[in-house]
Amino acid sequence: MFNIKLDPNESIHDQIISEIGRLISLGILEPDEKLPAVRETAKELGISPNTVQKAYAALEKSGLIYSLPAKGSYVSSGGKAAETVRNEAAEALRAAMRKAAETGVDRAAVDDIADEIFGKKL
């Protein structure tokens, strides 16, 4: 279900959190939609269930998902979850852009990266 490529530069725990957050912010995962079981996700990714459980716990702590005992984990209701993801992404982008500016990356290079991510210029 999740598009995770097991990037060696980022922990799998963080990749799971990022991917679920991305799917929520895009509306692909809808409010009250059940997430795959921890064991199912772990088996699909070939990782420890503990890693998935820790990622789900972090997502729950951030308010993006909620868990029901013996029933599973679900996407939180309302716009708060998507807004939280967008705010976190915006802050991460600000930090990355500050670092880029401090290290001499120019505006044209930043624009090229944005075009690469969001598609061609309008």
Where are these regions (language model features)?
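Short, Lys/Arg-rich nucleic-acid/phosphate-binding segment
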Residues: 35, 67-75, 79
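A short alpha-helical element within helix-turn-helix/winged-helix DNA-binding domains
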Residues: 34-45, 59
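Extreme N-terminal segment that seeds HTH/winged-HTH DNA-binding domains in transcriptional regulators
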Residues: 1-34, 40, 84-122
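Short, hydrophobic-biased segments on the C-terminal half of alpha helices
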Residues: 20, 56-57
